Amino acid sequence: MLKSILVMSILPAQLIFGEIIGELTFDNRYFFNVGLQDQKKNHSSFSFSPEIFKDDSNRIFHFKAKLRKDSEDSGRNLNDIQELYLINIFEDKEIKFGVSKEFWGVTETSHRVDIVNQTDFTEGFDGEEKLGQPMIKISLERSWGLLDIYALLGFRARNFSGIKGRLRSPLSINEKNSLYSSSSKNKRVDFAFRWSNYYDNLDIAISHFSGTSREPRFLPSPNKINALVPFYEVIDQTGLEIQYLLDSLAIKGEVISRSGHGDRYTAATYGFELTQVGFLQTRMDLGWVVEFNHDDRLESSPFVLGTRFSFNDIYDSQILSGFIINDRSKELGFLLEASRRIGECCLLSLEGVYFDDTDEDNGKQKLFQAFMEDDFLRAEFIYYL
């Protein structure tokens, strides 16, 4: 069904707008150990992302799809319309209608407030990739700030790795029998708003979301042994984003208060990024990232120490590295990401993730326990059409 929609969408657009741009991607992940459920070490995937963009002064059309095929894990296969919207621009407002992706947040390591779109949970370890969300969005720009009002038409359930996949829970996820607290199930219309403004060097945003939680809880599956079923509850979440720029220092913070997902809880990510411009009298910039995480539901508050090298060359070369430290459970995670353009046609990126855990059973809640055999290196090659 979705493939038919893709074809029907692409062909008229090609006739109207001409050439289709896009990306072809080859992705290979090598895991250093066999998985806890005897999954293979080597996983590769191909993806194709066609895209069309047209800006006619007071009207904008955007189409982007993503099709992914994984060599081992059927759970990573994806046919998704990520953008298919029309924006009408008026003198005092903008109206967007269609499928789109909206990002909220200012911090680097955990985007607490970012809730409009469902996470593409099989794409990356950081959870930053999103699925398209049908919506109507009205944007009002006034002297007191920018107000975005959303009607979110229907719900996208989270995707999970299959039984042959990596970076998955020890128990399989029974996605097909997902449960909902709303009688409308995945047809419920959710609502959200976000107000944002800036005052000199201070950026601030306040948001509220009322609808089906993008993050499920898990219950024992009634018809599968050793399996869990996602349970999506109706929640209310209020969020605050703050970013203050002081020369080369950026102080950032996000905090949410959520009800409906079990007991009401508060979660926050806050920290700073200090940038050394012209590091060691070169053209490179070096950024130091320090962020702390808090969640009322967890007994520990892991923090992140990271660096970001920007080479400022014609190839847009960058290296990002960081340690995730959980002092109470004595866990340590390390992440390395590097990317570099190859001419104007291609991009090569590398990613490495390492988990370290003490063998000591100290009685503390473990964050990485399910991933202790999932240290990996990932290479991704993108060809721009």
Pin down the residues of each PLM region.
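Detector for outer-membrane/organellar transmembrane beta-barrel domains
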Residues: 211, 246-327
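Outer-membrane beta-barrel translocator domains and adjoining extracellular loop/strand segments
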Residues: 32-43, 72-80, 108-114, 160-166, ...
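Residues that define the transmembrane beta-barrel architecture of outer-membrane proteins
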Residues: 38-46, 77-82, 130-134, 141, ...
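Outer-membrane beta-barrel "beta-signal"
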Residues: 272, 354, 371-385
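Residues on the lipid-exposed face of transmembrane beta-strands in outer-membrane beta-barrel proteins
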Residues: 48-54, 83-88, 136-140, 193-197, ...
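Transmembrane beta-barrel strands of outer-membrane/channel proteins
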Residues: 24-30, 63-67, 97-99, 149-153, ...
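Repeated loop/turn-to-beta-strand initiation elements of outer-membrane beta-barrel proteins
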Residues: 20, 57-63, 92-95, 144-147, ...
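Outer membrane beta-barrel
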Residues: 53-166, 200, 353, 357
